[in-house]
Amino acid sequence: MDPPAEKPGEAGGLQITPQLLKSRTGEFSLESILLLKLRGLGLADLGCLGECLGLEWLDLSGNALTHLGPLASLRQLAVLNVSNNRLTGLEPLATCENLQSLNAAGNLLATPGQLQCLAGLPCLEYLRLRDPLARLSNPLCANPSYWAAVRELLPGLKVIDGERVIGRGSEFYQLCRDLDSSLRPSSSPGPRATEAQPWVEPGYWESWPSRSSSILEEACRQFQDTLQECWDLDRQASDSLAQAEQVLSSAGPTSSFVF
């Protein structure tokens, strides 16, 4: 499946702003954002996203992005999903030195050479260029030998398109690929096999943020709630003191005492 065609009036698209980021995360500072999900918002411009220097997990899938320029400053980014956009290159990711997982299925990447910018990323182990379940792909995936080209270009990858290529289980996936190749339609006449349908909904196998990131996010939210309660108590105490002072001042000095 190719990326969605541009709709009338969508050329400008939406731009990421500080207000948008703060409203979706509840954070006071952009540098404090660790996890960000901006899926399917019609975004065409990443705007100030490059200021989120602490960002570790980012989902930009299902938008209208044509470039990733601001992501070049995100050195802590570990998981990135830019599937189903209009990207023709990934060059800004060359400086994302902590990137471990990249989903770029459903874009306009035409040749394996456009992945050369990823060759210097020491932590990159998971790469997806094609997602049969979501019916997303890239033009380069039309070449049956693209797998071999990607493996040669990025030898550190452990998983390509959801299939393990290094380590335990890689032999099983290789066997499946060999069987798949042998079952591809030939030029000989005969009934055409029924196309396999997805077993699960798109996004079922999507990776989610690590437990540590989720715990940290929850802790931050609890801290914000506690801080808000402190502000409320301080305001109530100030109101009580003001009322007490008003009562004392209106009573005046006491002239006599009764025992």
From Swiss-Prot:
LRR repeat segments: 32-53, 54-75, 76-97, 98-119
Keywords: Leucine-rich repeat, Repeat
Stretch forming the signal peptide: none
Gene3D superfamilies, sorted: Ribonuclease Inhibitor (3.80.10.10)
Domain of life: Eukaryota
Stretches assigned to the LRRCT domain: 138-178
PANTHER family referenced in this protein's UniProt entry, alphabetically: LEUCINE RICH REPEAT PROTEIN, LEUCINE-RICH REPEAT-CONTAINING PROTEIN 61
Name of the featured protein: Leucine-rich repeat-containing protein 61
Lineage: Eukaryota, Metazoa, Chordata, Craniata, Vertebrata
Gene designation: LRRC61
